[in-house]
């Protein structure tokens, strides 16, 4: 019996600690899915201007005619009726790129803003540069990323040395344009 006593004590202590951790998380967990964080608010103001913003939790109830797609994190609506999508896409970093794509009523891109990026400083983080993000404003339809100077209206130039991150931003914009085209925008 004495040879099993340390095992039993260790198992009991581990079980008690695990239960305490579970209880602590249950009492202190805050669901942030309906909250506009400071970083998201900054991105909203950059892309859509000053104003009041709210997250739309139920797209059908709001009258958009579709359910929230899996590739969209949040739909943010400004009090003037304009909307933006928060989209997390793959970049070079495993954490991805958290992007905000604001849309014009005609379905073109109003502005693109970076909520957060954890890519290589000086390379992947260059997708935050205003010159790169400005390429997307006014664009409609699916965009293609090119390494050289764009020759067509549906092309945007990648950031040199940050192809993965540039591809991620372009993917986020393409997702936003596609989802916006499916929305019933009558409200």
Q: Model regions: which residues?
A:
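Flexible, solvent-exposed loop/hinge segments and secondary-structure transition points
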Residues: 2-187
């Amino acid at each position: 019996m004495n040879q099993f006593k340390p095992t039993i004590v260790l198992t009991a202590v581990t079980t008690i600690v695990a239960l305490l951790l579970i209880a602590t998380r249950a009492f202190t967990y805050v669901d942030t899915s309906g909250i506009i964080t400071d970083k998201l608010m900054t991105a909203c103001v950059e892309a859509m201007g000053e104003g009041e913003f709210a997250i739309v939790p139920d797209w059908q109830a709001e009258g958009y005619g579709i359910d929230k797609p899996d590739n969209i994190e949040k739909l943010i609506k400004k009090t003037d009726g304009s909307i933006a999508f928060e989209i997390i896409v793959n970049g070079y970093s495993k954490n991805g790129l958290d992007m905000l794509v604001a849309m014009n009523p005609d379905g073109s891109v109003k502005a693109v803003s970076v909520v957060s990026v954890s890519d290589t400083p000086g390379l992947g983080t260059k997708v935050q540069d205003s010159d790169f993000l400005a390429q997307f404003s006014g664009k409609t339809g699916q965009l293609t990323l090119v390494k050289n100077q764009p020759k067509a209206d549906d092309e945007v130039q990648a950031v040199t040395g940050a192809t993965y991150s540039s591809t991620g931003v372009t993917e986020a914009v393409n997702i936003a344009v596609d989802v916006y085209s499916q929305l019933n925008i009558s409200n």
